[in-house]
């Protein structure tokens, strides 16, 4: 990594930090506000980087790092811009006695004209997070409402203007915001709520910009054996696998209890099937009719089915261009003897390294329906043609016999001429 230190729009050090090791965790979950976290171990041979004051070189009062990921001779990628949140120097102190003519220390342990000089060497552990933390810290002092006529694409950039530039992908739709909308305290959560109205999400780009994007879309990369794949792991858990949704409310007229429920009637999780009965309960005083209760139960069921996924833990060669939220395809060898391809969304990324980058680990959520379909396919079959190789003994069916054994002394002499 190449890491530059900035504060207040000015470069603090003329040279990049000497990074001994580093790690990164990027999370793209629905409820995550600050998605990227990084840790660095920085060499400090002169002992000058360990912070004492809040505005020292690696101090926590607004110091930012511009992180560039260099990939051998293949160029470089602006990985991110992050803000330092913690620093911890680990120092080694040495001392020596030097001549200092005229130096007299009363009751000192050294003779006159001698002085002890200390030198400090250190490594500094630095933790940092992406720039959304500034928006998360900048809470509203009083309730805020959008201006009349505001839309998703006008209000979100306005809320975040003090902290970063917002860039919308071309496929992000726009929508008007209700005039009665009120935001209190949490600025970043208000931004999340605004984007959720059109099904969009945000993530921070390599130049410190906020990218607003739509989940889904076409895969941007295929990872498979002999093409970057190191390993694939997966696991299953029965936790949270519901098959019935029961919604409760109260009649507006007399306060009597309302109950409505829907079940899964087919598939491996069907109600009263081998999985058993696993109901989920939801109660709200806002539900005042059976129709409302039933409609919400259907919604909960559909949301569950849409979220049902197989999570793959994928290790690959260094991939600095990948971001949480990207769609990729993972090629997995299966027991049938071929590779199947599972499309999925990256929900988290882990990277790290020392003097060189190490493998990238990504967690990929693959929709259960896509996995079920992929397991029934044979992708290699599309490469079958009617072209056949030359017919030689080694390609003949076994029923044709085998090449007879011939020794040199059985070959006629004129064949050797």
Question: Residues of each region from the PLM?
Answer:
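Exposed loop/turn and edge beta-strand positions of beta-sandwich/beta-sheet ligand-binding modules
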Residues: 78, 122, 241, 340, ...
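SH3/SH3-like beta-barrel fold
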Residues: 364-366
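Surface-exposed aromatic
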Residues: 172-181, 309-310
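Glycine-centered loop/turn motifs
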Residues: 60-64, 149, 184, 226, ...
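Short aromatic-glycine-enriched beta-strand elements
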Residues: 360-362
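Acidic, small/polar-enriched beta strand-loop surface segments
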Residues: 1-13, 192, 196, 206, ...
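Assembly/oligomerization scaffold segments
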Residues: 1-146, 193-199, 203-204, 213, ...
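Amphipathic, non-transmembrane alpha-helical segments in extracytoplasmic/periplasmic proteins
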Residues: 33, 40, 128, 143-168, ...
């Amino acid at each position: 990594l190449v890491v530059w230190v900035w504060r207040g729009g000015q470069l603090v050090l003329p040279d990049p930090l000497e990074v001994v090791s580093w790690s990164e965790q990027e999370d793209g979950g629905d409820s995550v506000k600050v998605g990227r976290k990084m840790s660095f171990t920085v060499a400090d041979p002169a002992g000058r980087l360990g912070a004492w004051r809040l505005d020292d070189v690696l101090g926590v009062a607004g110091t930012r790092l511009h992180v560039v990921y260099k990939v051998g001779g293949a160029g470089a990628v602006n990985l991110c811009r992050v803000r330092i949140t913690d620093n911890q120097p680990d120092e080694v102190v040495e001392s020596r006695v030097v001549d200092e003519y005229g130096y007299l220390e009363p009751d000192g342990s050294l003779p006159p004209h001698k002085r002890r000089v200390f030198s400090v060497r250190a490594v500094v552990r630095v933790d940092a997070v992406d720039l959304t933390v500034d928006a998360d810290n900048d809470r509203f002092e009083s309730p805020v409402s959008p201006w009349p006529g505001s839309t998703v694409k006008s209000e979100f950039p306005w809320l975040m203007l003090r902290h970063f530039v917002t860039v919308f992908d071309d496929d992000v739709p726009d929508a008007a915001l209700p005039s009665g909308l009120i935001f209190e305290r949490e600025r970043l959560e208000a931004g999340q709520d605004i984007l959720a109205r059109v099904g969009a999400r945000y993530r921070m780009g390599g130049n410190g910009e906020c990218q607003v994007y739509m989940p889904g879309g076409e895969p941007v990369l295929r990872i498979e054996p002999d093409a970057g794949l190191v390993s694939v792991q997966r696991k299953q858990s029965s936790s949270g696998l519901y098959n019935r949704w029961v919604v409760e409310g109260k009649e507006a007229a007399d306060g009597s209890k309302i109950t409505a429920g829907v079940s899964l009637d087919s598939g491996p999780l069907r109600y009263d099937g081998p999985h058993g009965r696993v109901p989920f309960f939801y109660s709200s005083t806002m539900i005042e009719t059976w129709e409302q209760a039933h409609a919400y139960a259907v919604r909960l069921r559909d949301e569950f089915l849409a979220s049902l996924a197989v999570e793959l833990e994928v290790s690959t060669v260094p991939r600095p261009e990948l971001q949480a939220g990207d769609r990729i395809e993972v090629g997995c060898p299966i027991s049938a003897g071929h590779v199947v391809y599972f499309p999925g969304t990256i929900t988290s990324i882990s990277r790290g390294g020392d003097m060189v980058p190490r493998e990238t680990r990504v967690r990929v959520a693959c929709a259960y329906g896509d996995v079920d379909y992929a397991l029934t396919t044979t992708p290699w079959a599309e490469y079958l043609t009617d072209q056949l190789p030359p017919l030689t003994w080694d390609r003949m069916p076994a029923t044709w016999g085998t090449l007879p054994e011939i020794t040199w002394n059985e070959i006629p002499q004129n064949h050797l001429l």
